[in-house]
Amino acid sequence: MLCPSCNSESSRVVDSRSIEMGVSIRRRRECSECQTRFTTIERSVLLVVKRNGVTEEFSREKVIKGVRRACQGRDVSDDALKRLAHEVEQAVRVAHGSQVPANQIGLAILDPLRTLDEVAYLRFASVYKSFNCAEDFEQEIESLRAHRQALAAPPVGDNSEDN
């Protein structure tokens, strides 16, 4: 790391902190030559591979923008959208490492969005899954109902009512 004051390559880390919900590291450094202190931000790059083979950096803002459109008119906070984007980024990092196919980002959005707001989920899914008719919506609504019932059902082997 070059010192911004004297261009020396020799510096030591004085302090390190995780920022941006663990995606980046903020390091406070001190130049060994001139003792100037400066800050660096380090982050692991996540690349999105588009259908045509072109790669670009993952953008939480793009995720938020797409989901915000689906949430238009719904009571969904900006903080909730930021948490969802972070959750999506973490999920694709775990599943795909440093490069993720673009279509996997849309898939990773669906589950947390379904939990956040079912109407927004239907809107997003209708575009992502290219719904063509009312039956597509009906099938997705049935899937939502089944998911909701599965979450509400007690775990198998749960005898809490017997006590």
UniProtKB/Swiss-Prot annotation:
One annotated GO molecular function:
zinc ion binding
What does the cofactor field's note say? Binds 1 zinc ion.
In which family does this protein belong, per the annotation? Belongs to the NrdR family.
List the Pfam families hit by this protein, alphabetically.
ATP-cone, Zn_ribbon_NrdR
Q: Which domain of life is it from?
A: Bacteria
The ATP-cone domain sits at 46-136
Described by its record, this protein's role is as follows: Negatively regulates transcription of bacterial ribonucleotide reductase nrd genes and operons by binding to NrdR-boxes.
Which keywords, in A-to-Z order, does the entry hold?
Answer: ATP-binding, DNA-binding, Metal-binding, Nucleotide-binding, Repressor, Transcription, Transcription regulation, Zinc, Zinc-finger
Q: Which cofactor does it need?
A: Zn(2+)
Task: Provide one Gene Ontology biological process annotation.
Answer: negative regulation of DNA-templated transcription
Q: By what name is this protein known?
A: Transcriptional repressor NrdR
- Kindly list the ranges of residues that form unnamed zinc fingers according to the record: 3-34
